[in-house]
Amino acid sequence: MTEFKHETVLLKEATAALAVKPAGTYVDATLGRGGHTRQILNHLTTGRLIAFDQDEAAIATVTADFGTLPKQLTLVHRNFRDLTDALTTLGITEVDGILYDLGVSSPQFDDSKRGFSYRFDAPLDMRMDQRQTLDAKTIVNEWPYADLVRIFSRYGEEHFSKQIARRIEQARTVQPITTTFQLVELIKAGIPAKARRTGGHPAKKVFQAIRIAVNDELSALESSLEQALKLINVGGRISVITFQSLEDRLVKTMFKEVSSVQDVPRGLPVIPASAQPNYRLVNRKPILPSEEELAVNHRAHSAKLRVIEKIHD
């Protein structure tokens, strides 16, 4: 088996933000390679931790690493959009904290067979859950030009979405686009030479867009956070680590909405209880990685941690 190095980002900060109680019930919504899971377990005595991951490889790797799973830990091979259903199946209707570490893990990026990276020539795949049928190859070869433009613009914030989509549309009429390197060359061809020389790898934005579309990432996140806000107890917290602006804006917007005072007439001496928010932002601004972490973990550079706490039912 190939060994992949993975450094968990904001490991101590995200776990500390949960304020873990030894007898509490917690959820790690993104198991990955188990960094945050282990950190939470270190604080539990009689408590319980449910760790989710839609990637079978993550479940298998962590299971093998533990050998025998701690009695406090339950692993769930499901997307975190199934949060409520999965917890209900386990007899859990409320929890004391939930942690999300979003995006693609380093092992997923570094496994060339998964097709997540423009650095390796591999079949176009990008599925986090290998059980699903939609993959990157299907999107690139079958989705209409207009849909390609839409996802490149919306999910990749790519300025040359139309030009790239046109190149793809033209190429796939000649032969199917089946590998990451084929796609990289088409992306490069759709971006003017001057623009290719700035802003990092020219394929980065389109690969991100296709990955988000394949895995329906933003919709899954929004659905999961809505459930999480209902599941946590008073005093419970949700910690979310994001790595790109689309995720961060979604989390920021949702947290701001539920932690803000509802519309009330101006001039009221006291804001009525019905208008008071049920949640509070633990930090007004996101927590960022330390200089020390940035020096040893390049993946941490875009990370932001946002935390919210439930203060009323």
UniProtKB/Swiss-Prot annotation:
Its recorded reaction(s) are: cytidine(1402) in 16S rRNA + S-adenosyl-L-methionine = N(4)-methylcytidine(1402) in 16S rRNA + S-adenosyl-L-homocysteine + H(+)
Instruction: Provide the top EC class.
Output: transferase
- Tell me the keywords, alphabetical order: Cytoplasm, Methyltransferase, rRNA processing, S-adenosyl-L-methionine, Transferase
Any one annotated GO CC term: cytoplasm
The UniProt similarity line reads: Belongs to the methyltransferase superfamily. RsmH family.
Q: What does this protein do?
A: Specifically methylates the N4 position of cytidine in position 1402 (C1402) of 16S rRNA.
Protein name, entry field: Ribosomal RNA small subunit methyltransferase H
Where does this protein come from, organism-wise? Answer: Lacticaseibacillus paracasei (strain ATCC 334 / BCRC 17002 / CCUG 31169 / CIP 107868 / KCTC 3260 / NRRL B-441) (Lactobacillus paracasei)
Gene coding for it: rsmH
